[in-house]
Amino acid sequence: MTGPPGNPAFATIHEFFPGNTFYNFECLRILSTAPYGGCDPAEFLTAIAAIKPSDPETWATAWSHAASQAERIAEDALARGDTLAARDAFLRASSYTRASGYMRINGPTLDRHDPRALPVARKTQALFRKALPFLDCDARIVDIPYRPTQYSKPVSLPGYVYIPSPQNRLPDGKIPVLLNTGGADSVQEELYYIHPQAGHARGYAVITFEGPGQGIVLREKGLYMRPDWEVVTGQVLDWLEGYAATLQQEEGLTLDLSRIAVVGASMGGYYALRAASDPRIKACLSIDPFYDMWDFGTRHISGLFMAAWTGGWVSDATIDRVIGAGMYLNFQLRWEVGVTTAFWGIESPSRILREMKRYSLQGGFLARVQCPVFVSGAGKSLYFDTEEHTMRVFGDLKHLGERRRTLWMPSRPEEGGLQAKIGAFGLVNTKAFGFLDGVFGVKRVLEAET
């Protein structure tokens, strides 16, 4: 269930923790937000100096300390009326708080009700929301109604709508919409540093939300993840239609519902493809998705052993013991099983593997996608082999023709070669919004030309 041992992802760039690809990746994930307000390099370096590899408690302590320091700076700045400094520090405090709980998302056992997770999620959200009034866009908190089943009572999914400021809106006054879905372990406050901050500056309204199995919805409402994400995004789109009508009527703002796109990375890339089966989605950006989660989860387990298990010759208890031994020896595997335990509500490794079979694009699902699609892979991915996943996705989109499907497959870290484009957020936004501008007919001219 882990990425390949000896992954060469960090062979060409600096390692904060030599030989520990997982920790290096997660540190770079935090540092990647620095240009967009989520991290300060000196605070970052101070924190990682206090972290011991594969030790979730020193990780939590270091980032909690950084978060507290940034929060103090923010409150002092706010008291002085320096809203820009307060905004920046609140964003960093939120980012570090998210990071603090990341490695210990579960307890020392497979306890999906870890009492430490919810306070971290709430604090991450609260600090981020203190920064919202001072962003250089119109950022709004929304609640999106969602019914887990046809007959269940609706619950609300928390979301943000980032509306471009007047000076950043497109000349025709209409605002295209980008729906940004999260994935397995991100929270929507972290997503801000990638597509929302870049989108509103380019004239796009960007909507983020947390669905079942994600962020505070998992920890506060107890809703577990589901494979048919098109059901979730379908309800988000239903809400958007009413929300856009209200904005038009009350404020004269025009969200262009004929130009709605969806984007997600890693598991979010899989979710984006599921969402794109809805005809209301007119463009899809699937960043480094998986094609079949079962194939990913079992790729480093003997095929004969797995065949014996699925054929009934090996018991679930044996599978649990084998994976349990691996968890004892490998922190990354222990963390991965803990994460899936949390978002699926399943405590047995054998049951987790079975659940993975439900998360697949096999069976011709992508034939339902009719909009232009941008697909990327990561040549130095920590998790997904590009041939097994990216190219299978791209191949299943052949019905779109070469003009309506786009493939980007970078290999080096600085080119976007790490999973989810960690370390290359600026570059992925250049590619993503270039693609969307082309699909939606957005023409940009230099100010001097106008």
Curated annotation (Swiss-Prot):
Subunit structure: Homodimer.
Species assigned in the record: Aspergillus flavipes
Keywords assigned: Hydrolase
A Pfam family this chain is assigned to: Abhydrolase_6
GO molecular function terms attached to this record: hydrolase activity
Source organism, top-level taxon: Eukaryota
Keyword set includes Translocase: no
Similarity field: Belongs to the AB hydrolase superfamily. FUS2 hydrolase family.
Enzyme active site: S266 (nucleophile)
Role this protein plays: Hydrolase; part of the gene cluster that mediates the biosynthesis of the cytotoxic leucine-containing cytochalasans, including aspochalasin C, aspochalasin E, TMC-169, flavichalasine F, aspergillin PZ, aspochalasin M and flavichalasine G. The first step in the pathway is catalyzed by the hybrid PKS-NRPS ffsA that utilizes 8 units of malonyl-CoA to iteratively assemble the octaketide chain before addition of L-leucine by the C-terminal NRPS modules. Because ffsA lacks a designated enoylreductase (ER) domain, the required activity is provided the enoyl reductase fssC.
Pathway: Mycotoxin biosynthesis
Enzyme class name: hydrolase
Protein name: Hydrolase ffsE
EC number: 3.7.1.-
SUPFAM superfamilies listed in its UniProt record: alpha/beta-Hydrolases
